């Protein structure tokens, strides 16, 4: 597999397509990141105060610009999740390799954001199945980690289906703030 920061791969199944995010995704993504019911499921740990609530086209465009810049700088990759039956973008997946002084050093961090109507175990499992098998090779990581709040019951079921296990270890941000609620897959 080529370097993910030189050529972003696409992944697909009968229902879903994961492809690199594009500026033209803004209108669809506004429905995701402007969805107040989806907001509690977004992982904004260590994101400098951004809570990922983008309720205007201007804010959504600004976020996408940052995602594209971050890819160019090799900070993280952001895939759009396309529902093939509607040809609509229903969310994103962000991944990167974390280098740190804590238990999450050399972990592939997986952030999965979908609209609230897609926050269902079976849907999340289908989407995760497209990227998880490739994650270790793409990011040369020793484990995957994803945040699952205690109220995210459907998300927890999807993660358990892959063998993710809840950990009590804290992810420590660059400013020393510690975050809990992570699940690990090795």
Task: Please provide the spans of the model-predicted regions.
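GNAT-family acyltransferases
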Residues: 1-117, 134, 138, 150-154, ...
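Conserved acetyl-CoA-binding loop-helix of GNAT-fold acetyltransferases
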Residues: 121-134, 161
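Conserved hydrophobic beta-strand within the GNAT/NAT acetyltransferase core sheet
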Residues: 143-148
């Amino acid at each position: 597999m080529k370097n993910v920061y030189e050529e972003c791969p696409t992944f697909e199944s009968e229902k879903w397509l994961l492809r690199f995010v594009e500026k033209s995704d803004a209108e669809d993504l506004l429905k995701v990141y402007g969805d107040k019911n989806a907001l509690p499921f977004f992982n904004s740990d260590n994101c400098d105060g951004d809570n990922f609530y983008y309720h205007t086209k201007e804010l959504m465009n600004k976020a996408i610009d940052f995602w594209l810049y971050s890819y160019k700088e090799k900070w993280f990759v952001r895939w759009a999740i396309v529902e093939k039956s509607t040809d609509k973008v229903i969310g994103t997946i962000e991944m990167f390799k974390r280098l740190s002084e804590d238990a999450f050093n050399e972990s592939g961090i997986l952030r999965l954001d979908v609209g609230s109507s897609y926050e269902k175990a079976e849907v999340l499992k289908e989407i995760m199945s497209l990227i998880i098998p490739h994650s270790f090779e793409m990011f040369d990581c020793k484990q995957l980690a994803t945040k699952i709040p205690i109220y995210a019951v459907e998300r927890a079921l999807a993660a358990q289906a892959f063998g993710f296990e809840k950990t009590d270890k804290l992810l420590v941000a660059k400013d020393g703030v510690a975050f809990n609620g992570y699940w690990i897959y090795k």
